């Protein structure tokens, strides 16, 4: 039986065993499951300006983490080698939310201010971002989200209480351009998000 994923505007109707357009969400026994939860493809200590957030704790560094999966298909994506893979293709290392938060805290001596969820579209696996962000907050550190902005209001409501700064990476300003990138029903998305 098909199930509908409600994370983004695509509202993928997935048969059992089928991945959504993002490559990170899958119908498993009638439930939409986040296949990239804790499956890390990239982890680095980056300057905050690389996010790019030049006015948010300028001169600091932040532990940047990413997985696989993206709900847009931009031909100019600088991280396509990780963001466009699905669970069956991506090379990953599992890192529990607690371990990520602990690692971020241990890097304070090097100037780390928290965790940035980046490199792919992190909200294809928003459950991991939410769970990690809660723990990062308990350590008194910051959470930064680098996103394409294509997520549902329900996802937004579950995450925003834990996010300190966000960069919404606009790809263009016209509906027809976003359609080329795979972002359908732009009017509804803009209204919802």
Predicted features and spans:
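A short acidic, helix-capping loop that chelates divalent metal ions and anchors anionic groups
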Residues: 85-86, 174-180
């Amino acid at each position: 039986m098909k199930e509908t994923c409600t994370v983004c505007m695509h509202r993928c109707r997935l048969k059992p065993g089928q991945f959504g357009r993002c490559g990170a969400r899958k119908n498993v026994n009638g439930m939409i499951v986040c296949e990239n939860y804790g499956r890390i493809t990239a982890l680095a200590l980056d300057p905050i300006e690389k996010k790019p957030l030049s006015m948010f704790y300028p001169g600091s560094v932040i532990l940047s983490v990413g997985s696989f999966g993206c709900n847009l298909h931009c031909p100019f994506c600088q991280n396509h080698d990780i963001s466009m893979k699905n669970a069956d293709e991506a090379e990953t290392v599992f890192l529990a939310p607690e371990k990520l938060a602990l690692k971020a805290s241990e890097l304070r001596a090097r100037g780390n201010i928290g965790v940035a969820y980046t490199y792919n579209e992190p909200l294809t696996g928003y459950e991991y971002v939410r769970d990690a962000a809660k723990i990062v907050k308990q350590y008194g550190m910051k959470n930064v989200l680098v996103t394409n902005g294509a997520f549902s209001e329900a996802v937004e409501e579950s995450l925003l209480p834990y996010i300190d700064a966000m960069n919404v990476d606009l790809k263009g300003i016209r509906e027809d351009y976003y359609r080329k990138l795979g972002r359908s029903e732009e009017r509804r998305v803009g209204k919802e998000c």
